[in-house]
Amino acid sequence: MTPYSALALQMDCSAINALPDRGSVDDAISKTLDHVDKSIAGSKAFISTFSGDTLKLVVLPEYFLTSFPMGESIAEWRTKACIEMDGAEYQRMGEIAKTRGVYL
């Protein structure tokens, strides 16, 4: 087995609770995924430069896309913040993983 590095990516989780509608939530999630992509690219370059290892595994924080429910009912949270397994968010994460050559 070829050695590789893993990264526990630490980042702020932007809460979406106060956002007014699903469109605003989708915009916030998109910005978070932009940040994830840039962070992985930078981390991969740093790890390669200073250790010579290849970054292959990136672990993201729990609730990194939305933060957590704060008083919302299950139905409210489902409508406001949940993502679909075949939705744009997972597709984007797949694209990031493929482009960066990592597993998320």
Predicted regions and their residues:
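Hydrophobic structural segments
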Residues: 1-104
